[in-house]
Amino acid sequence: MNKLKLHGFNNLTKSLGFCIYDICYAQTFADRDGYIAYIDDEYNADRLTEILRETCSIIGANILNIARQDYNPQGASVTILISEEAIDPRDVDTSEHPGPLPDSIVAHLDKSHICVHTYPESHPTEGLCTFRADIEVSTCGIISPLNALNYLIHQLESDIVTIDYRVRGFTRDVNGVKHYIDHQINSIQNFMCKDIQSLYHMMDVNVYQENIFHTKMMLKDFDLKHYLFNSHPEQLSVQEKDLITKRLYKEMQEIYYGRNVVEV
């Protein structure tokens, strides 16, 4: 696609959203609580902030503000407000006066921001534990959130990933013609490196006429030892290993396809 000469600012909004799932099996209630405590500490607000800072660097965005919070009993959130151009310190108002109303903050946040929220949870009786990180990178202008795709997948090593990318609005060229997208894309997969593609089964559901792209990913290889928390396959009987494997596989299939599997 040839470069466009625009009339004014690039008004397209590009949003990249991830749901990243980590799944494990904990044999006892104590192990389940231990997994949730471990994952909650592993992905606390401080670490998530560093991941998002690096994401900003990768996509070439400038950080305006960071808000972060760890929650009790578990979970964390980080939101970073970003801009396309560096901020001149002379433009920062440090005078003593009331700040902006919430409506104006939300309006700005909808333009360019990066946010992540975490959701640890567990099955009440079957030992299944899942951790979900929900990430959104939303930009306006020439910044592309797709540049951070490989970095985020590598940083948050996951069993299942669902990715949404959409382009909204339009921008106008110097001749007054509206353009609803400013780059070529037919699949999110085309922006992934080969090593990621080799690790995952992937499926696309795209709505090209609406500039909406969706990719689901699930790890190809299954090794039970990677899914056991605080235990090892050698400690389990053949029957126990088969039961746990079936439970994990069913859980992963349900999350991947977004529907519950009814056993007949």
UniProtKB/Swiss-Prot annotation:
The keyword Amino-acid biosynthesis does not apply. The active site is at 112 (schiff-base intermediate with substrate), 117 (proton acceptor), 140 (proton donor). Pathway: Amine and polyamine biosynthesis; S-adenosylmethioninamine biosynthesis; S-adenosylmethioninamine from S-adenosyl-L-methionine: step 1/1. It catalyses: S-adenosyl-L-methionine + H(+) = S-adenosyl 3-(methylsulfanyl)propylamine + CO2. The record marks 111-112 as: Cleavage (non-hydrolytic). InterPro entries: AdoMetDC_fam_prok (IPR003826), S-AdoMet_deCO2ase_bac (IPR009165), S-AdoMet_deCO2ase_core (IPR016067). Its EC number is 4.1.1.50. The modification Pyruvic acid (Ser) is found at residue 112. One of its GO terms (biological process) is spermidine biosynthetic process. Keywords: Autocatalytic cleavage, Decarboxylase, Lyase, Polyamine biosynthesis, Pyruvate, S-adenosyl-L-methionine, Schiff base, Spermidine biosynthesis, Zymogen. One of its GO terms (cellular component) is cytosol. Heterooctamer of four alpha and four beta chains arranged as a tetramer of alpha/beta heterodimers. Belongs to the prokaryotic AdoMetDC family. Type 2 subfamily. Catalyzes the decarboxylation of S-adenosylmethionine to S-adenosylmethioninamine (dcAdoMet), the propylamine donor required for the synthesis of the polyamines spermine and spermidine from the diamine putrescine. NCBIfam families: SAM_DCase_Eco. PANTHER family: S-ADENOSYLMETHIONINE DECARBOXYLASE PROENZYME. This is S-adenosylmethionine decarboxylase proenzyme. The lineage of its organism: Bacteria, Pseudomonadati, Pseudomonadota, Gammaproteobacteria, Enterobacterales.
